[in-house]
Curated annotation (Swiss-Prot):
Coiled coil: none annotated. Pfam families: DUF212. Keywords: Cell membrane, Membrane, Transmembrane, Transmembrane helix. It is a multi-pass membrane protein. It comes from Bacillus subtilis (strain 168). Its main location: membrane. It is found in: Cell membrane. GO terms for cellular component: plasma membrane. The keyword Oxidoreductase does not apply. The chain crosses the membrane at residues 10-30, 137-157. This is Uncharacterized membrane protein YuiD. The keyword Transmembrane helix applies.
Length: 158
């Protein structure tokens, strides 16, 4: 049962859960809408990916030191993950927004066309997921969440 005593792993899992759950009240404060689906969705404030990888790196640093090979690997993994969250995934989300708008505009055009034969049953279209990546501030606070949560957990459990 060494897995249950693996501090970097447990702190990463705690950071993911904390970051996902805290999205609900943050969104409620911003929009006055309670959306529990945020607990299981990607994107949003804070980034749970960033929280997880920074918690992992912080946990490894606390257990093995900043000069260890394990810390080097986890730190580079964290940098790549956070870069991807603000880069490729964010741009994919922005493209999904544009594509979804194009689909809406196209459907409106088709529905308004005079000679368009009405189908017996309209085919439902699947909307592309737009909230894929993160704004840099979301990644920053996700990373900060992971570090601070791991330090608090280390204080109580290490």
């Amino acid at each position: 049962m060494e897995l249950l005593t693996n501090f970097p792993l447990l702190s990463s899992l705690a950071a993911i859960i904390f970051a996902q759950v805290i999205k609900v009240p943050i969104q409620f404060i911003v929009s006055r809408k309670l959306d529990w689906s945020l607990v299981t969705s990607t994107g949003g404030m804070p980034s749970s990916h960033s929280a997880a990888v920074t918690a992992l790196s912080t946990g490894v640093a606390l257990e093995h030191g900043l000069d260890s090979s394990l810390f080097a690997v986890s730190a580079i993994f964290a940098v790549i993950t956070m870069f991807d969250a603000t880069g490729v995934r964010r741009h994919a989300g922005e493209q999904a927004t544009v594509i979804n708008k194009l689909v809406i505009d196209f459907n409106r055009f088709v529905n308004e066309a005079k000679d368009f034969p009405k189908a017996a049953e309209k085919e439902k279209q699947k909307k592309l997921k737009e909230l894929l990546g993160h704004q840099p501030i979301e990644v920053f606070f996700g990373g900060l969440t992971g570090i601070l949560l791991t330090l608090v957990l280390a204080y109580f459990f290490m």
